[in-house]
Amino acid sequence: MLFKDQLFLASQYAAPHHLVSRLMGLAADCRTPAIKNWMISRFVRRYGVDMSEALVQDPLAYDTFNQFFTRKLRADARPLDTEPGAVLCPADGAISQLGPIEHGRIFQAKGHSYSLTSLLGGDPARAEPFMGGDFATIYLSPRDYHRVHMPCAGTLREMVHVPGRLFSVNPLTATHVPELFARNERVACLFDTEYGPMAMVLVGAMIVASIETAWAGLVTPHKRQIRAQRYDEAARAPIHLDKGAEMGLFKLGSTVIVLFGPGRVRWTDTPSVRGPVRMGELLALPKA
């Protein structure tokens, strides 16, 4: 391992994750034109952000960096795959891993896996429907579109906010930080779908100031205790989201993990590990 990589990993354990993220969140909400314009311009140049797809294409027209970062796209920018039964990719990014959930563990990187039960907040009953199922992990890079959409239509059953660390998420940390995705702060959303139970886990990372959902708004920042909110109670109006509907967003981004139960879906040949994907592309089909 290169010395600079060793230093980076050491800094991940030493850094005050949540303080850094809160400070970044304050800066990202700054409305002072000179400051926010400098931040946006530097970001666009560094990461080569394609603004031609954005609903508002002038990057300096946004009031804050966060508004720019969570920009909406033109209606025609992400057409949804029309194959019957298609399960869609929920976000722009790259497939970092996908495959079966084996012995209650999800593959992270060579030599590393993490607990399905821990990922979903530590409740074995919550994890049970996904034992022996399938997962896909999608990493959102800084230049990507950072809104997350439904892979298929679903009715919300439960949302769980799991506090945790905020390690950076990238190939280096995935390879060297054990249980990375089950240690970082995350929001797990469980749905009932035509393919059975589905979970979408939005994982935070260093400088991810907040995670929001379409129905609850701001879910993070950091709280000390796991919070689970049921949405399938008789007293509550059901929350149903159509295929392709927006379900959440990152203010600065990280990772989305999609889970299905056993025998429900098969990943298509289209997504490949480390390969780029776009929201709305075909990700999986129902198993025969």
Swiss-Prot record:
As recorded in UniProt, its EC number(s) are 4.1.1.65
Q: Which residues carry this modification: Pyruvic acid (Ser)?
A: S254
Q: How is the cofactor bound?
A: Binds 1 pyruvoyl group covalently per subunit.
Its required cofactor(s), as named, are: pyruvate
Q: Does the keyword Oxidoreductase apply?
A: no
The record's keywords, sorted A to Z, are: Cell membrane, Decarboxylase, Lipid biosynthesis, Lipid metabolism, Lyase, Membrane, Phospholipid biosynthesis, Phospholipid metabolism, Pyruvate, Zymogen
Q: Main location per UniProt? A: membrane
Q: Please name the InterPro entries in this protein's record.
A: PS_Dcarbxylase, PSD-B, PSD_type1_pro
To which pathway does this protein belong?
Answer: Phospholipid metabolism; phosphatidylethanolamine biosynthesis; phosphatidylethanolamine from CDP-diacylglycerol: step 2/2
The reaction(s) catalysed by this protein are: a 1,2-diacyl-sn-glycero-3-phospho-L-serine + H(+) = a 1,2-diacyl-sn-glycero-3-phosphoethanolamine + CO2
Its EC top class is lyase
Q: Where in the cell is it found?
A: Cell membrane
Summary of subunit composition and partner proteins: Heterodimer of a large membrane-associated beta subunit and a small pyruvoyl-containing alpha subunit.
Q: Describe the family membership recorded for this protein in Swiss-Prot or TrEMBL.
A: Belongs to the phosphatidylserine decarboxylase family. PSD-B subfamily. Prokaryotic type I sub-subfamily.
> What protein is this chain from?
Phosphatidylserine decarboxylase proenzyme
> What lineage is on file?
Bacteria, Pseudomonadati, Pseudomonadota, Betaproteobacteria, Burkholderiales
